């Protein structure tokens, strides 16, 4: 009897896009935050996780990274961002695509430098959840969310998810999930199908509010 082929995913690459300019907060990635540059907080968390084999920094700020003591190593790859995908209006999916095309990996974990409170424990648990989902064919990607149960209104003050005349406890309201951009976990295959970090069959992972 022919046994099914088991694919063992081993190489995990973390994608950490970083640019020199920010339209809202000038130079935010390099501003000091509690004793070190903002980008170092999530970078150091990723570096502390042995399951992550490679951290890929897609950037237009190589010289600034060097000034702040960050150099390439066997676990850190600094990629110069092509001019055509530089700028504030460029979709993040285009930047991710540039990395996926050029850096082979079994699993990609994408996060942002603006997640300094994201914990090592959350990253590891999300990764384990994704690996379990893949093994059981439950999902092809994962993204993090905030779980919300509260009363929403539209811009005209019209109730969206509740009846103001019948105020039930908020814990009994329909649960809504807010994408929080903490983490996206996916494969090359799932990315190719949607050309996006969220695949065709994603799973949601609720993160602690203090981290998101």
Regions found by a protein language model. Name each.
Residues 9-26:
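N-terminal nucleotide-binding beta1-loop-alpha1 segment
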Residues 56, 62-109, 117-125:
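Short phosphate-binding loop-to-helix
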Residues 18, 59, 145:
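Short beta-strand/turn micro-motifs composed of small residues
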Residues 88-89, 94-95, 116-208:
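Conserved core of the sugar-phosphate nucleotidyltransferase
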Residues 38-54, 66:
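A short, N-terminal amphipathic alpha-helix
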Residues 52, 105, 136-139:
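Short, high-confidence coil segments that cap the C-terminus of an alpha-helix
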Residues 11-16, 39, 55-57:
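Hydrophobic targeting segments
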Residues 1-8:
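Short, Lys/Arg-enriched N-terminal segments with co-localized hydrophobic residues
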């Amino acid at each position: 009897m022919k046994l099914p082929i088991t694919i063992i995913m081993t190489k995990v690459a973390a994608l950490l896009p970083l640019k020199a300019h920010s339209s809202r907060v000038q130079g935010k990635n390099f501003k000091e935050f509690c004793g070190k540059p903002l980008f170092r907080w999530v970078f150091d968390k990723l570096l502390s996780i042995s399951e992550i084999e490679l951290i890929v920094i897609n950037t237009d700020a190589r010289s600034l990274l060097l000034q702040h003591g960050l150099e390439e190593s066997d676990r850190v790859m600094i990629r110069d961002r092509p001019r055509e995908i530089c700028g504030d209006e460029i979709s993040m999916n285009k930047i991710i695509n540039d990395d996926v095309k050029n850096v082979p990996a079994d699993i990609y974990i994408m996060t942002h430098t603006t997640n300094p409170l994201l914990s090592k424990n959350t990253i590891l648990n999300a990764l384990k959840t994704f690996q379990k989902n893949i093994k059981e064919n439950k999902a092809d990607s994962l993204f993090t969310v905030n779980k919300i149960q509260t009363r929403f209104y539209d811009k005209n003050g019209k109730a969206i998810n509740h009846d103001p005349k019948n105020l039930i406890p908020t814990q009994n309201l329909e649960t809504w999930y807010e994408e929080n951009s903490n983490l996206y976990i996916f494969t090359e295959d799932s990315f190719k199908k949607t050309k996006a970090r969220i695949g065709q069959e994603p799973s949601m992972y609720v993160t602690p509010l203090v981290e998101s």
